[in-house]
């Protein structure tokens, strides 16, 4: 046995080559019309966060995409609502393909697109990129969470707004990644509710960074960045309770300003702010609408987890997707469609009242 064989990859079962980001982009190109939509809506998000556009950013959609057909039906409905409220809201659809797990579980469409534990990542990458192309072709901009540093090379050119989640905001890898991403990025506060990790992350990502990554041709590369000027903070609640109330928002905005960061922020109506109760999300959205209507300037955006069917269902990877209810989440419980349309109307009305 060679010496290297005695010490390397002892717990690795196999390596499977994947197409490079450039190869997948050539197969599924962004196209001029989609690229124009992405560029325009990224600039609109930037202007909203800076207070130059008085609309509200609303990032809304399924907790995760597991069924592309149902996701496209949702997108078709959402684009109608986005057009209805276009003078008051910039609606961006959640298109989340990677899910962080506290222990184990389904890791998302990219990792396991067949929902059966087969981990066909090549198909997952292809499905994710195709889905983003289909949604943007409808005129609907897309948002996603960036969970690791390789997959963005396959999808980021089709993404208008990105998030770094509560479990990864403190990670140096994700701060470095965000510094080089081409779209506005929001960092969630920590799972314990602490805000400082998000402040530190936003500051770090706005600065130039150098790190190990991959280039479009798939080669390992030294990546040097200019820093991302469009970083912000997302209040999502935490172990110590919700943080969407007027005092929470005001204090967070003051801390952002004191740190020299964008003082306007995004509030997540789900997760710790709803106690993971999808019914409670609608109540949180209504309370945020009241803050906005009362003239609160710190809230630039709201996040909602929403699907065609309310609630959630358990995915059994041993069975696969055959028994699943179409349009219902297999991860976090979501608001149903009717509640979503109502929440969007309330948020739009709050913007009009604030003017």
PLM regions with names:
Residues 2-8, 88-244, 248-249, 271-272, ...:
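Active-site-facing alpha/beta catalytic cores
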Residues 57-70, 332:
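Conserved phosphate/anionic-ligand binding catalytic regions in large, soluble enzymes, centered on
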Residues 20-29, 225-239, 324-328:
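Gly-rich Lys/Arg/Thr-decorated short loops/hinges at beta-loop-alpha junctions or inter-strand turns
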Residues 68-80, 103-111:
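Glycine-rich loop at the start of a catalytic domain that most often binds anionic cofactors/ligands
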Residues 8-52:
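N- or domain-start disorder-to-order transition segments that initiate the globular core
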Residues 293-355:
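Active-site or pore-adjacent capping/gating segments
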Residues 49-52, 79-86, 132-139, 223-225, ...:
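Acidic (Asp/Glu)-rich catalytic clusters
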Residues 61, 267, 336:
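Conserved, mostly hydrophobic/aromatic
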